[in-house]
């Protein structure tokens, strides 16, 4: 991509892939539900201390579809961009990175949040993912 993310992203987002050394990132898709459900379910106790309260239906397919709709609305409004993180080699979904509160103009800024499945933590995968997203953005 010739321009940086914070300059312009538009309709190019849907097919986007960001490469790191150990991971690659792309926007979430409906077909990611099983992998997302598995890693989030397996990591629930690990993630709960760091995240807002989990509603009782948070891991359902319907909830995942609502999440994807919210992500699409954020992209349409140029307000936020979400990525799933996949491990190189086996393609396992290991976490997610979210860019939110996107501000255009002079400041060209955003906030970043992330989550990592417990079985993939402390291996440098999220560090690699964050570095790849930062390089992509700026």
Where are these regions (language model features)?
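GNAT-family acyltransferases
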Residues: 1-119
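Conserved acetyl-CoA-binding loop-helix of GNAT-fold acetyltransferases
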Residues: 115, 122-136
């Amino acid at each position: 991509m010739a321009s940086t993310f914070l300059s312009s992203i538009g309709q190019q987002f849907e097919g986007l892939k960001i490469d790191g050394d150990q991971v690659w990132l792309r926007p979430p898709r409906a077909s990611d539900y099983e992998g997302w459900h598995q890693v989030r379910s397996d990591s629930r106790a690990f993630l709960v201390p760091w995240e807002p309260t989990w509603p009782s239906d948070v891991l359902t397919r319907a909830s995942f579809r609502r999440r994807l709709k919210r992500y699409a609305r954020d992209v349409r409004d140029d307000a936020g961009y979400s990525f799933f993180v996949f491990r190189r080699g086996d393609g396992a979904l290991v976490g997610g990175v979210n860019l939110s509160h996107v501000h255009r103009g002079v400041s060209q800024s955003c906030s970043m949040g992330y989550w990592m499945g417990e079985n993939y933590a402390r291996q440098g995968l999220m560090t690699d993912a964050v570095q790849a997203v930062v390089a992509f953005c700026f």
